[in-house]
A protein has these predicted regions:
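Single conserved hydrophobic/aromatic residue that forms the stacking wall/gate
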Residues: 1-7, 11
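Register position in tetratricopeptide repeats
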Residues: 5, 42, 76-77, 110-111, ...
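Conserved structural position within tetratricopeptide repeats
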Residues: 18-24, 54-58, 88-92, 122-126, ...
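Residue-level recognition of tetratricopeptide repeat
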Residues: 26-29, 63, 97, 131, ...
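TPR alpha-solenoid repeat register
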Residues: 29-32, 66, 100, 134, ...
């Protein structure tokens, strides 16, 4: 952000805090704290934003939008257990909240609680059968449970509808890799890179396939490309060592 923009936001912060001090019991303070949290989040001040959202929830403990905002910050900070609690509270208030269903399902997958994840994905897809994130999440779940054909069926249908989506080609390539269909995976990754040459995930996955095939030169080139696109070098230290 520009210095001018930062100053404007600091002034806004001070005005909000002044309003809170003038009327500490005003129910509208929930909105003020929520707005302050939004500003702080945009500045990357996640700890301050969490504090603001928590203050807002003191005034309006069942406010779904504020719970969702706080949960999103918890997710960005890697605090998935706290995010989970907020998403559960959202769903207690609104059983059809699609964002909460999607994110809670994702957390269940991280926890390897696949039956619970499937329940939430199925609920989401009942509400919104064309949900991109819901279908992609379910495909990932099928893959993690070793149900590769089911995962491919979902991804093939999605690609039929959106054939220019690089993310879907990468997802399908990863399933094909696990099925030992490396040649098919490489074709999909080539298409993904054609559609999005800045996709670090595509180079990373292709590099791993090349490494498994003992094509060390090709693997090294892809890993180095992934690093140039933002993958931390430390994450690929072992792979690059194996390329020597």
């Amino acid at each position: 952000l520009s210095i001018r923009r930062q100053r404007q936001m600091c002034i806004r912060d001070r005005l909000l805090l002044q309003a809170l001090k003038l009327e500490p019991k005003n129910a509208k303070n929930a909105l003020l704290f929520s707005n302050l949290g939004l500003v702080q989040r945009r500045l990357g001040e996640f700890d301050k934003a969490l504090e603001s959202y928590s203050f807002a929830l003191n005034f309006a403990p069942l406010a779904v939008p504020i719970l969702l905002d706080r949960a999103a910050i918890y997710m960005e900070m890697g605090k998935t257990d706290r995010a989970y609690t907020d998403y559960c509270q959202v769903l207690d208030e609104d059983k059809q909240n699609k964002e909460a269903l999607l994110m809670r399902a994702y957390i269940y997958v991280l926890r390897r609680d696949y039956p619970a994840a499937r329940i939430d994905y199925n609920r989401l897809l009942e509400l919104d059968p064309q949900s991109y994130s819901g279908r992609l999440g379910l495909a990932t779940l099928e893959q993690k449970e070793g149900k590769f054909r089911e995962a491919l069926e979902i991804l093939n249908k999605m690609l039929a509808a959106t054939p220019e989506d690089a993310t879907l080609y990468i997802a399908r390539a990863d399933v094909e890799r696990e099925m030992k269909h490396e040649d098919l995976a490489l074709v999909d990754l080539e298409e993904a890179i054609r559609l999005d040459a800045a996709s670090a995930d595509a180079y990373l996955l292709r590099g791993n396939i090349y490494l498994a095939q003992k094509k060390k030169g090709l693997a090294k080139a892809d890993f180095e490309k992934a690093i140039s696109l933002g993958v931390p070098p430390a994450d690929l230290h072992e792979q690059l060592r194996q390329c020597k």
